[in-house]
Each structure stands twice: as structure tokens, then as C-alpha cells.
């Protein structure tokens, strides 16, 4: 069965476009029915980020879940990994995060977690999709069996304590000046507080959400403001989270960006030295730079690659017994601590290495020289541009030109109508030329189909 709603990271789209109150209500009903297993009273944890449409979707989902007899625990704006953690901690049957992650406020989405805090499998998502297209009137609970909803206090402190416990008890961030950019998103309350409790000198930006400014010129996808602030405040390091705090990008004392590949290199090498790697390898995606792979090989660490998407990274980690994985975009999964990507917990591991080594972040976090990599996005309105004959010809010509001295990766986004074109190789000029040729062909195909 083709998937109409679920992409690589839940359901995502324009608020009041794809993501309507009607859809949110039905997702609540369908997911509630799928997860009513056993004879106990069933519960769902619902969190959200700070975008305006979160109120609308939250209320619709509460109506959906309670209409099929599920109790709802509302935790308000919280990071996605916090919702996953709370789902397991509070013995809930299901967790929901209302967020479109790094997208702008106009979009929103619904991410679902099972009772152990893991994202749902494809099979479970298909079960929910099937119910979305069925009438619900005969599946609703009797009046006496309807669910209840309540807001839960103290959840911020729970997540702060959870994050702090990922560091050794005797490790302090005293003496470290940290600028943190919370993207005006879900982490704006918890992360600055946690850093302060750990002893850091904290300077916060992106902590004034108004419903519209999430990810707007801030956060992990727009680190320029953080780079400027780090230089201005002469900070030791900067941390940029995205809107739901499941990814992180960092900045060194010079204001230079440290991407997810460099963060993976730091954590992998440090954990290997400390005997903390479950296996002599880590998991990343096909988007990770070849420079990372070469560096890890020199350290005796294997790089296992998956398709793009943190869910595929986690699947490989769980299947093959790895405990470190991630993406260049900043999704870092440390399965000793979390069931999903946790930007703040990953950042804490980097801060721990910085404190341990006592060296500038620019030295600690530059483990390899990345090969030139060009990534461009082509947005399209209709059709299947990748099937166009002109596009296929451009791709074939580009591969011949690279002739084994680089690689191409061309794929549709799983969350939006965008085709991502990535080229990588030792000759930057050649890589730029072949990527631009493919981008032009895709643009022409998209225009012809519109």
C-alpha cells in the first residue's frame, strides 16, 4: 500500500493545508485504536514546539485520542527527544510530538513514538494510515469510557535531570562560556537552564518564541546569528539546535561552524578511547562526507552507511549493535542514552571532551578535512522530475565526468516537494559544474510539468 500521509519523519505539511484539525483528529483516533493493547487504562503523551498552529493541532489530537478512550498527558513545548523519553518514563502507550522540526512556522507535523520511546515502524504507520481512510463512527468509545486530558507539571525538570545524568557526576562546565541558540523553539526553557546548572556561563539567543519566529534566521539551519554572537561575546563554543531540538550544529571560538560529521568524529574517537563504543564502528548516512569515513578508518572505526533519515540510522544501530550514529545535518543518536536524535545530549558529549582535553574548540572539533561537497535543493510543484529524459541524461553525463573521482547522490526529500542534489569529490570546480548541470535539468523538467 502506498503511503499517503507518512513520510520519513512522521506526517508533515502546511498547517491548514495537509495538516488540518480534521486530519489531526483522525490521526489521534487511528493511533489511539492501534495502541489500545492490553486491559490497562491507555495513555498518550503529547508535546509540541512553539509554532502558532501547535495549539490547533494539539486540541484536535486531544479530541481524537479521548474519543477512542485514551487518556492524554499534555507536556506543552518540549524537545522531541524529551517527549520520547517521557513516553517511556511515564509508562504511556504512545507519544506524540507536534512539530515540523527545522521548517518555518507555516508548516507543522505529527511524530509518533511507541511505548519504549522509539519512532514507529513502517508496518505500524501503515496500520494507522489504513484507519485514516475508514469511517470512525462505529469505533468510538461509549460515553462512560471516554478519555481524560490533563497538563503535567514538572516535565522540564525531568528532562533537565535526564540530560545532566548523561555526563559524569564530577564533570563541571565551570569556566566555559557557551552561547546557545534554541531557534525560538521547543528547547527555549530547558537547555539554557540545564547548561547553567552544569556550571557554564550561558548566553542565550533564540529564546523568545512568538509563534511565528521558530527557525527564522536562527537555529541549526541558520547558524549565522550564532557565529556572530560567539565572536562578539568571545565565547568558547556555540550550540545551535533546531525547532524541536533533535538536531544540533556547533560553532567554535572563531565563529566557524562544526557540522554533524565533525561531531560524530569527535564522539566516536573519544568513546573508542574510553571503551564506550559497543562495536568498533558507527552508523551514518550516504550524505556523510568521505572525509569522515577516511578519518574513522585511520582510527580503526568502521563507518556503516544507510539511506538518508535518522530512522534508518537508528534501525541499523539497533539491528547491528552500534551505539553511536547520526547525520551531517546534526541528528546525533546515542542509544546508550536516548531512543532518538537528541541535539542537547550530543552537545553535552562534545562539551565533556572539550573540558577533558582543555584545548580550544577549534582544535578539538576539527578532526578531518572534508572533501568539497555541494548540496543544492530543487523545489518542484508537480510531476516526477527525476523521470524526465533530460534529467536522466544530465545525471549520466555527470557520472561519466566524475569517472570514479567523486560521487553523486540525487534523491527526493521525504518531507517536502524538493529534490536534493549532492556532489562530492576532490575537485571542487568540477563538482560544482556537474551539480549545476543536474539542477538546471531538474528546473527545466519541473517548469515543463507545472
UniProtKB/Swiss-Prot annotation:
GO terms for biological process: carbohydrate metabolic process; peptidoglycan biosynthetic process; UDP-N-acetylglucosamine biosynthetic process. Keywords: Isomerase, Magnesium, Metal-binding, Phosphoprotein. SUPFAM superfamilies: Phosphoglucomutase, C-terminal domain, Phosphoglucomutase, first 3 domains. Activated by phosphorylation. Coiled coil: none annotated. One of its GO terms (molecular function) is magnesium ion binding. This is Phosphoglucosamine mutase. The lineage of its organism: Bacteria, Pseudomonadati, Pseudomonadota, Alphaproteobacteria, Hyphomicrobiales.
Amino acid at each position: 500500500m502506498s503511503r499517503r500521509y507518512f513520510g520519513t519523519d512522521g506526517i508533515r505539511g502546511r498547517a491548514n493545508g495537509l495538516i488540518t484539525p480534521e486530519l489531526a483528529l483522525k490521526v489521534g483516533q487511528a493511533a489511539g485504536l492501534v495502541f489500545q493493547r492490553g486491559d490497562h487504562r491507555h495513555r498518550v503523551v503529547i508535546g509540541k514546539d512553539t509554532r502558532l498552529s501547535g495549539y490547533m493541532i494539539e486540541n484536535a489530537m486531544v479530541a481524537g485520542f479521548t474519543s477512542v478512550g485514551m487518556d492524554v498527558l499534555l507536556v506543552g513545548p518540549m524537545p522531541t527527544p524529551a517527549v520520547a523519553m517521557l513516553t517511556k518514563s511515564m509508562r504511556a502507550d504512545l507519544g506524540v510530538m507536534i512539530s515540523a522540526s527545522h521548517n518555518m512556522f507555516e508548516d507543522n507535523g505529527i511524530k509518533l513514538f511507541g511505548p519504549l520511546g522509539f519512532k514507529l515502524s513502517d508496518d505500524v504507520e501503515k496500520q494507522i494510515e489504513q484507519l485514516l481512510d475508514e469511517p470512525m463512527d462505529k469505533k468510538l468509545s461509549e460515553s462512560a469510557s471516554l478519555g481524560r486530558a490533563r497538563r503535567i507539571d514538572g516535565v522540564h525538570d525531568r528532562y533537565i535531570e535526564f540530560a545532566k545524568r548523561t555526563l559524569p557526576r564530577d564533570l563541571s562546565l565551570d569556566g566555559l562560556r557557551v552561547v546557545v541558540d534554541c531557534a525560538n523553539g521547543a528547547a527555549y526553557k530547558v537547555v539554557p537552564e540545564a547548561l547553567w546548572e552544569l556550571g557554564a556561563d550561558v548566553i542565550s539567543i533564540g529564546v523568545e518564541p512568538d509563534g511565528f519566529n521558530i527557525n527564522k534566521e536562527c537555529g541549526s539551519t541558520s547558524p549565522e546569528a550564532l557565529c556572530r554572537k560567539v565572536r562578539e561575546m568571545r565565547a568558547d563554543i556555540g550550540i545551535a539546535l533546531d525547532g524541536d531540538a533533535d538536531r544540533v550544529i556547533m560553532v567554535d571560538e572563531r565563529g566557524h561552524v562544526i557540522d554533524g560529521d565533525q561531531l560524530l568524529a569527535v564522539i566516536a574517537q573519544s568513546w573508542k578511547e574510553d571503551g564506550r563504543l559497543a562495536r568498533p564502528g558507527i552508523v551514518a548516512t550516504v550524505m556523510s562526507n568521505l572525509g569522515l569515513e577516511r578519518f574513522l578508518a585511520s582510527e580503526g572505526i568502521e563507518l556503516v552507511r544507510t539511506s538518508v533519515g535518522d530512522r534508518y540510522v537508528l534501525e541499523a544501530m539497533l539491528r547491528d549493535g552500534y551505539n553511536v550514529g547520526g547525520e551531517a545535518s546534526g541528528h546525533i543518536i546515542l542509544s546508550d542514552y536516548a531512543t532518538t536524535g537528541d541535539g542537547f545530549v550530543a552537545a553535552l558529549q562534545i562539551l565533556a571532551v572539550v573540558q577533558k582535553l582543555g584545548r580550544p574548540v577549534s582544535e578539538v572539533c576539527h578532526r578531518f578535512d572534508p572533501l568539497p561537497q555541494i548540496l543544492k535543493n530543487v523545489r518542484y510543484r508537480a510531476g516526477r522530475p527525476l523521470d524526465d529524459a533530460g534529467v536522466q541524461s544530465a545525471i549520466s553525463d555527470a557520472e561519466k565526468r566524475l569517472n570514479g573521482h567523486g560521487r553523486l547522490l540525487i534523491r527526493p526529500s521525504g518531507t517536502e516537494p524538493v529534490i536534493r542534489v549532492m556532489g562530492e569529490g576532490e575537485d571542487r570546480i568540477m563538482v560544482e559544474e556537474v551539480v549545476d548541470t543536474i539542477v538546471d535539468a531538474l528546473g527545466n523538467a519541473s517548469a515543463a510539468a507545472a
